[in-house]
């Protein structure tokens, strides 16, 4: 032992000096996780040999195991040694990987083991109890040092951030000027926060004036007159991102050729316009048939620094609607800002949508300040109304009173030359002026939604049969958006209900999982039907025939590797026509099981029995059903029909699809509905005008698998059969609803 001390006596003073200077051996070997304790701690718990033992062990990295030939063990206290036993020369070796892993695992569970636990560990690992004790002491010291270093770094960064913010405030105060007279601001007459807000408001007004002129220049229109009431302020080093409250939005996600500050300021101006459009009354909005009408002259006076004059080539549509929906404000904002959820929520209006670029994700934990570039295609459930395709910014902001606002605004030509390739509004036929909604929190999980739709669109391709509906705002206006939102919120509330109806109307549905799976399958069926009716580009349909008002549009597509559709060649046939009866009467007739055999070839004259029923809202017409057709010519039937009926003030739907019995049993047991093949058919029923008291516009659409081989060639006979089927169905419906006693033609089998 003396020889060991002699060999290293020159190291001991320097190490002790380091200890007195406040340094720890741990700082020299921070990369090692298994060091022995500091000298002071060791000395207090041993007889003086422990510090020298630790010195020797620290030379080898702190993971050495000290062993002795004596019974006391190396590094132990003098009281643990047998005085009659002849001491033997101690030897060292590193802790094994197994020992280190076991010690680390135990430390995670218990960083302060008692004497009994240390002895148990020593027996299991072949170490001395004092070695185990020293290891835990060192480990705790190391963890404490790392934690303190991390805290110090965080506090230092926070301190620097506060210093920088304080410096910015001082500079702003030094350069502050009155927004009205341009002289020094009288800070003493107002609070600091009020002064800061006034300064920000004045600067934002100036920026909005500037962006209005630039935006008008980009779209080739003369700039609006800039109001002289807000003189320009001195230039600021703050980015427009700061004015929007967008954190961490410095990444160049729009490309080098794109004026990103211009886009951000466009979003700010759109948000201000939306809020005022939603809150102002007369004379900006005047009462009109079926809602409110926008006063164009008052709009031009109210927003002189808006997005430029309206295009004479496009027709202006403006509408506003308010409703209270059964969804909390946080969930509603989340669904509007997630493109997938937004598309599913408004599947009858939005045939496709995508997020092209994200400029900001907003504040962590919510979407306050989120800004993204999106594209979407809006649709009407008729082949006689072309879809509207557009690219727009979507900006979300929470206002000081707690109200959330989500605004859309078209980019028009501002993105020309960049990767997105936006075209002018006139070329696309659709321009989205500031549109969106204000969302206010209400008690009991409800939200008050005020929706504003303000667009310019080319309606030249709209058929005369549907122009009254389109021009009244029933097709793409705020009333339809809000009515759809109300109905879908009730549907989601029904889907999330955990209880299964006990009154017997649930039928074969016995679990909440089966209920949710069936609703999810019906949701996909409705989305597929709506997209197919309008020949949306999402579903890759190709028109083969159809030009007149009641002509049948026949479209085809090949289904390959799509678990939601059967493989092969699928034909879709759709037509729209007018009926001289109210929409409610048409809806009740088509969803009535007792009259289904009068028009449905699938029933084939059999009796239709409802096997399951799920109510989807307050209106008894909103429901999902599972039907079974009992054919009189057979003892049992394998034909099941999934059907969803939905109705609101702007339209109604009866959509159905035959489903396989085995696949449906899986769904009813809570299985995945995405792998159930569906080909939906059905009806879309719209009022023929804004008052809703006249006739109905009915669209009939079928999807039929004509060949199970995707590579097969489409035969003219298949097209003729589908044409005959839809023509026969139309004639039968007309005869049944209008009371025509004429004999309807037989439908093809």
Curated annotation (Swiss-Prot):
The gene is ROC7. The keyword Chloroplast does not apply. This is Homeobox-leucine zipper protein ROC7. GO terms for cellular component: nucleus. Residues 137-218 form a coiled coil. Residues 86-97 have a biased composition (Basic residues). The keyword Coiled coil applies. SMART domains: HOX, START. It comes from Oryza sativa subsp. japonica. Residues 256-494 form the START domain. Residues 88-147 bind DNA. Belongs to the HD-ZIP homeobox family. Class IV subfamily. It is found in: Nucleus. Residues 46-57 have a biased composition (Basic and acidic residues). Probable transcription factor. Keywords: Coiled coil, DNA-binding, Homeobox, Nucleus, Transcription, Transcription regulation. GO terms for molecular function: DNA binding; DNA-binding transcription factor activity, RNA polymerase II-specific; lipid binding. Residues 26-98 are annotated as: Disordered. Residues 68-79 have a biased composition (Gly residues).
């Amino acid at each position: 032992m003396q020889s060991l001390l002699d060999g290293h006596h020159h190291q001991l003073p320097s190490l002790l000096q380091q200890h007195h200077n406040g340094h720890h051996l741990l700082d020299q070997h921070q990369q090692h996780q298994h060091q022995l304790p500091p000298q002071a701690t060791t000395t207090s718990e041993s007889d003086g040999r422990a510090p020298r033992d630790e010195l020797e062990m620290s030379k080898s990295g702190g993971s050495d195991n000290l062993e002795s030939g004596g019974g006391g063990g190396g590094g132990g206290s003098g009281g643990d040694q047998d005085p009659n036993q002849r001491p033997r020369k101690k030897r060292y070796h590193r802790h094994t990987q197994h020992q280190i892993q076991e010690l680390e695992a135990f430390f995670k569970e218990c960083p302060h083991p008692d004497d009994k636990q240390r002895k148990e560990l020593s027996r299991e690992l072949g170490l001395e109890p004092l070695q185990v004790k020293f290891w835990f002491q060192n480990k705790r010291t190391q963890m404490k040092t790392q934690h303190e270093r991390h805290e110090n770094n965080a506090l230092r960064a926070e301190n620097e951030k506060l210093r920088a913010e304080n410096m910015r405030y001082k500079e702003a105060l030094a350069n502050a000027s009155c927004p009205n007279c341009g002289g020094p601001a009288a800070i003493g007459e107002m609070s600091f926060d009020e002064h800061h807000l006034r300064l920000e408001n004045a600067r934002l007004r100036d920026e909005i004036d500037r962006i209005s002129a630039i935006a008008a220049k980009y779209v080739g229109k003369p700039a609006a007159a800039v109001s002289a009431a807000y003189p320009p302020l001195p230039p600021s080093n703050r980015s427009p991102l700061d004015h929007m409250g967008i954190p961490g939005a410095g990444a160049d996600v729009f490309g080098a050729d794109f004026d990103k500050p211009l886009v951000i300021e466009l979003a700010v101006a759109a948000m201000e316009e939306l809020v005022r459009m939603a809150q102002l009354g007369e004379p900006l909005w005047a009462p009109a048939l079926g809602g409110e009408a926008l006063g164009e002259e008052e709009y031009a006076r109210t927003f002189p620094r808006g997005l430029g004059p309206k295009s004479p080539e496009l027709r202006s549509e403006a509408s506003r609607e308010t409703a209270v929906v059964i969804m909390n404000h946080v969930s509603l904002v989340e669904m509007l800002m997630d493109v997938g959820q937004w598309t599913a929520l408004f599947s009858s209006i939005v045939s496709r949508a995508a997020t092209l670029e994200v400029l900001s994700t907003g504040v962590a934990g919510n979407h306050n300040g989120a800004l993204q570039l999106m594209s979407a295609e809006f649709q009407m459930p008729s082949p006689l109304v072309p879809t509207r395709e557009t690219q727009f910014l979507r900006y979300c902001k929470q206002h000081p009173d707690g109200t959330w606002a989500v605004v859309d605004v078209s980019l028009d030509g501002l993105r020309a030359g960049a990767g997105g390739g936006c075209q002018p509004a006139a070329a696309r036929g659709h321009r989205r002026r500031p549109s969106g909604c204000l969302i206010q929190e209400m008690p009991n999980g409800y939200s008050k939604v005020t929706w504003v739709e303000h667009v310019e669109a080319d309606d030249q391709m709209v058929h005369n049969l549907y122009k009254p509906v389109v021009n009244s705002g029933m097709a793409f206006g705020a009333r339809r958006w809000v009515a759809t939102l109300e109905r879908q919120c009730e549907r989601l509330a029904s889907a999330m209900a955990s209880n299964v109806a006990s009154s017997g109307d649930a039928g074969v549905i016995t679990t909440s999982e089966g209920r949710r799976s069936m609703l999810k399958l019906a949701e996909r069926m409705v989305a597929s039907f709506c997209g197919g009716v309008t020949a949306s580009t999402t579903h890759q349909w190709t028109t083969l025939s159809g030009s007149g008002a009641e002509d049948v549009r026949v479209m085809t597509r090949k289904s390959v590797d799509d678990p939601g559709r059967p493989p092969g060649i699928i034909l879709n046939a759709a037509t729209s026509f007018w009926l001289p009866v109210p929409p409610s009467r048409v809806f009740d007739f088509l969803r009535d099981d007792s009259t289904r055999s009068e028009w449905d070839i699938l029933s084939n004259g059999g009796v239709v029995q409802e096997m399951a029923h799920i109510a989807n809202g307050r209106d008894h017409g909103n429901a999902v059903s599972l039907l079974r057709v009992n054919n009189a010519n057979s003892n049992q039937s394998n034909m099941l029909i999934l059907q969803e009926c939905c109705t609101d003030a702007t339209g109604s739907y009866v959509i159905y699809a035959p489903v396989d019995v085995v696949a449906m049993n899986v769904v009813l047991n809570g299985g995945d509905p995405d792998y159930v093949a569906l080909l939906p058919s059905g009806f879309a029923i719209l009022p023929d005008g804004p008052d809703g008291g006249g006739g109905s516009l009915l669209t009939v659409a079928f999807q039929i698998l004509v060949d199970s081989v995707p590579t097969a060639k489409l035969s003219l006979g298949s097209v003729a059969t589908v044409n005959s089927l839809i023509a026969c169905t139309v004639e039968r419906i007309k005869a049944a609803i209008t009371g025509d006693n004429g004999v309807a033609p037989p439908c093809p089998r």
